[in-house]
Amino acid sequence: MLKAEGGTCNDPATCGDRHVLVVEQGTCRLWESYFTYRSAGGQWTSYSTAAWDLGSNAMRPDTWTSGDAAGLPMAPLLVRASEASAGEIPHALRVTFRDAVLANTYVWPARHRAGNSSGGIPFGALLRLKGSFAIPPAWTTQAKAI
């Protein structure tokens, strides 16, 4: 069964990015898409797709987009429930922002940009909490890890 982010919504103005992430069994290949929807006739359509070899650290060529506007794979940057429950997430996390705060530029490791602000956050920016940020003791193990 294939489910698209955004459910059955097919209106690009209101549905969000509608990503679909698929790991092809037996091939070690990840497929990711952007603005994916199912037509009335049952056909799946995507505005763009990208394939990733999960056995390689190779990046897309500079200026190439992917299912993600930054040109990066999404799946490896997502929080996994098992990591959060263990209290540690040993990799970078993918976060998203409204277009209005994203710069129309990118920095490594990103390969592409799609923002519309000249002074915003560049695609690929590495962000972190200030060292002075106090993690509330009442937060769950998962919330603290994230």
Question: Residue ranges of each PLM-predicted region?
Answer:
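A surface/extracellular/periplasmic glyco- and lipid-processing/surface-interacting theme
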Residues: L2-I146
